[in-house]
Design a protein with these regions (language model features):
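ABC-type nucleotide-binding domain
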Residues: 1-172
């Protein structure tokens, strides 16, 4: 599913309503005929792997950024990095998945570009492995070549999941 609209038209707000980050104040959102307010926030959160346009990468290890609270599975971890087109960069890091990002907590931490951060946010969403993947302007910080690589892999890495793609460009 693609949601395309002008900047400021409410695309991100729509997604945040679906994820129950905001409560619906007018009308209703139904999941299988049941009002979204009948579901716990935790059950809704478990449905979605989301990359918002205002994502955050934390000053912790690469592994902790991707896996969050999940158990670490090396094969799955590197497959997600591969699908997000950042595995090669991760494998060149001195401490691989244990390398800290940024220097806030570790003076040997590595600085990453905006495009690399966006790819890591995508890898994090893929690692969560939720049934619905939502990508809100997922390639905004990427150059055209990297953007094309992500789009060419998009169907393969969402596989049998529901995918919702948000963009202000119809060409995306």
């Amino acid at each position: 599913l693609a949601v395309v609209g002008r900047n400021g038209s409410g695309k991100t707000t729509f997604i945040k309503l679906m994820c129950r980050l905001y409560d619906v104040t007018d009308g209703e959102i139904l999941i299988n005929g049941t009002d979204i307010k009948e579901y716990t926030r935790e059950s809704i959160t478990g449905l979605y792997s989301v990359v918002f346009q205002d994502f955050k990468i934390f000053s912790v290890s690469l592994k902790d950024n991707i896996c969050a609270n999940s158990d670490f599975d090396s094969d799955r971890f590197y497959a997600c990095l591969e699908n997000a087109n950042i595995k090669d960069r991760a494998e060149r890091l001195a401490d691989k998945e244990n390398t800290y990002l940024y220097k806030d907590l570790d003076e040997t931490g590595v600085e990453i570009s905006g495009g690399e951060a966006q790819k890591l946010a995508l890898a994090r969403a893929l690692y969560k492995d939720a049934p619905v993947v939502i990508l809100d302007e997922p390639t905004a910080a990427l150059d055209p070549i990297a953007e094309n690589e992500i789009y060419s892999r998009f169907n393969s890495f969402v596989q049998n999941k529901t995918a919702i793609y948000i963009s202000h460009r119809l060409s995306s």
